[in-house]
Amino acid sequence: MKFTTYTTFPEQTSNESLWILVDSEQLQSNLNTYQINNLESILTATQFKANFNETLPLFGQLSTQPHSQLLGLGKAAELQAAKLAKLAQTIIKSAQNKFKHIAIDIAALPVEYHYLFALSLTQAAYGYDEFKSKKNEFVLQQVDLISSQTSLDENQLALVHAVQSGQSYARDLGNRPGNICFPEYLAEQALALAAEFPDLLKVTVLNEQQMADLGMYAFLAVSKGSERPGRIVTLEYQAQLEQAPVVLVGKGVTFDTGGISLKPGLGMDEMKFDMCGAASVLGTIRALCEARLPIHVVGAIAAAENMPSGKATRPGDIVTTMSGQTVEILNTDAEGRLVLCDTLTYIKRFNPAVVIDIATLTGACVVALGKVLSGLFSPDDTLAAELQQAGEQSFDRVWRMPVIDDYQELLDSPFADIANIGGPHGGAITAACFLERFTRDYRWAHLDVAGTAWLSGSAKGATGRPVPLLMQFLANRVSTNG
């Protein structure tokens, strides 16, 4: 979907439908720009008040656009960002299968919401039909956004397009089943990205023998139960090599049975989404390549499959990590931190400015924050504040949680340096504290996206979060650093 901005209705374009957003407190003034036949009698007859998400068809009443509708904002001054998605869904649901080109008058929408509204339209327009014999009949390609004043300059529109591309790509990867999307497949996707953007990307793939040579036995403890070998993949986005890089590390457990600590069968199909952290890293790298932001970024993917077998790790096994620390694996279903800890050690070779890991790490984070906010853990107040700001700007929000020494003793083991679980309480925090032990040589933040990376129920599927947040964070760094 492509966007173009106009200050007035573009009568010479090929748009087939017009939506006009209207403020319930300024209904008449919002419509003064348009010559609408019988407006007063229509409003009286329909009792249209422009309440939130209330629609009013005006078919044949505008000479400039026969197919037009009003869409209420309620009181625009009281509109909240959380409601933008609903407005976008209303428009997309109505237009997506009918029109290639539509126009939306957003003059009544507060200017500070223009970027988020455009982004919401792209998110609402996503559909996944890769494995369906009957494909979605989506035809919408172009949206004209009309407002005499807008925050959507050329840079903002470029960011919308880039985020749309990266987020949709991440959603596609997340939605693919485990028999298609396995560790080697993620490595192939990274190589395909590099082939698409050869001037921007350098990809390195580590196989299991190379990991063993580096001493990555925590990672290998996860992948050893599977017939599918694990991979660590790095993608270096080389637009500004003289800078120390931002490193993004994604958990890529392509299917998580729990291993010997087997998960319950109900809902296990959703464990294909346990690689959504890695998908978000790949999506962010794609978005960076589309936007060509002048910044140095490294994406790292820890890709493994966690399966039970005669070769699988047993509860109580002890392994040595790449850092030299030993780990007692009390629960093989706490595997994400094991693939991440070795990857977080490996990426030190890039001399990072900051490191952000993204992982569907704990059910405890879902209990704490639900499906609305991602968990943010960082001992670095400045980095945490930057991520919180980016989350608000992109409406891909986070909530900061503690990662403090008081919790570290819960990870003590009588047999090894550290246990891979910390008991029944504060599971999201102790998981972050585990990772913190491997990140003390650089600035670091951890995003637990177990609650936000996918949805269940009727809207089941990957969300592509936190690609919008990560791209906003990187764009902000470009702006700050000039």
From Swiss-Prot:
Family affiliation: Belongs to the peptidase M17 family.
Q: Where does Mn(2+) 2 bind?
A: K251, D256, D274, E335
Its biological purpose: Presumably involved in the processing and regular turnover of intracellular proteins. Catalyzes the removal of unsubstituted N-terminal amino acids from various peptides.
Keywords attached to this entry: Aminopeptidase, Cytoplasm, Hydrolase, Manganese, Metal-binding, Protease
A GO molecular-function descriptor: metalloaminopeptidase activity
Protein's name in the database: Probable cytosol aminopeptidase
Q: Which InterPro entries match?
A: Leucine_aapep/pepB, Macro_dom-like, Peptidase_M17_C, Peptidase_M17_leu_NH2_pept, Peptidase_M17_N
> Which reaction is this enzyme known to catalyze?
Release of an N-terminal amino acid, Xaa-|-Yaa-, in which Xaa is preferably Leu, but may be other amino acids including Pro although not Arg or Lys, and Yaa may be Pro. Amino acid amides and methyl esters are also readily hydrolyzed, but rates on arylamides are exceedingly low; Release of an N-terminal amino acid, preferentially leucine, but not glutamic or aspartic acids
Record: active site: K263, R337
Instruction: Describe how the cofactor binds.
Output: Binds 2 manganese ions per subunit.
**Where, subcellularly, is it found?**
Cytoplasm
Cofactors needed by this protein, per the record, are:
Mn(2+)
* EC number from the UniProt entry: 3.4.11.1, 3.4.11.10
Q: Which Pfam families match?
A: Peptidase_M17 (PF00883), Peptidase_M17_N (PF02789)
Any one Gene Ontology BP term? proteolysis
List ligand-binding residues for Mn(2+) 1. D256, D333, E335
- Organism listed in the record: Acinetobacter baumannii (strain ATCC 17978 / DSM 105126 / CIP 53.77 / LMG 1025 / NCDC KC755 / 5377)
Cellular component (GO) terms are: cytoplasm
Q: What is the lineage of its organism?
A: Bacteria, Pseudomonadati, Pseudomonadota, Gammaproteobacteria, Moraxellales
